[in-house]
Amino acid sequence: VQTQKTTYMEGWLPEAATEKIGKLLAENGCAYEFSDPAEGEDPPTYLENKPLFHAFGSITELYGMPAYGTVVDPNPFVAVFFFLFFGIMFSDAAYGLILTVIAAIYLAKAKPTGDAKRYITVALFVGISTVLWGSVFGSWFGDLIPTLSRMITGKEVQIPLLLDPLAQPMQMLILSLGLGMVHLFVGMGLAAYRMIKQGHFWDAVFDIGFWYLILLGLVGALVGIQAGIYMAAAGALGVLITGGRHKKGLGKITGGLGSLYGITSYLSDILSYSRLMALGLSTGVVATVMNTLGSLAGNGVIGWVLFIFVFAVGQTFNFAIGILGAFVHTCRLQFVEFFGKFFEGGGRAFAPLHHKTKYVQLLKEEN
């Protein structure tokens, strides 16, 4: 609302900013009033993240904004697990190095802003993760170094590694499922934290605590710990007794049985993390196959020309497909398995008042 001499404005601001904004308004002769959101109003969601986690908010927002008043900020957890999972699935150190360099150069030269800056920053971080995991797996353009050394000297030079996914698939699967269980347990813990903060302590015990007993007990039983069987049985009994507590009559029994049937959902979620192993294997295998195809013609001039051509085309294709697959499946693990445990959506992002420009960048003048 505006007249010839006055302007009336209203909007939302974070509670932590009221003192600073109030001081600025007072210094400029403005009358103002702060108030909490009234019933029926629709305030936006403001997530205050540290710079390290801020970029990964762009991943969360692909799924949706948390509801206003949410007690759990998912961005720090998304940042940690997105960093880990993307690197495992892209899995080639040379690919990660290329991605890191491209992202770093773009950030330094183009100086993007807004969402573009956040996405490129995510690319920088996951590129670093890929270098780390690729080094663990000993994959640099697949087996390029052993292949080149064999073509040039007739002897293969092997790169030191900590885990060979091709030679040790079971260890790779255990690593993938283990990280998956940690991911799910964190999501369950966040759900319990939300319930407790909202005053539902016993719901957290019954709906989350008993499932911790079941899952941890089953893991213990699988590795030969006898007590794990009793833990799982105690958790199952707890779920059976309390699962139908909000229902009446026969529903208390059927509700408990229905809740206990949720074990199939948890097992399905855990098995879903086998995609970490599958994509990690596929990236290295395809890169290695390209190197093998390129080396079939031998060491002559034609052989080297063929090798360079197949290497360039094949590795570029594998890089593009690998980065797409790693992004899609990492997002899938966040959105379905992780967010499904605790995320409350339906919010809208807080958008601060600022100049929106397309082709120019406004810089703050230093006094």
PLM regions and their residue ranges:
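Coiled-coil termination/hinge junctions
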Residues: 1-21
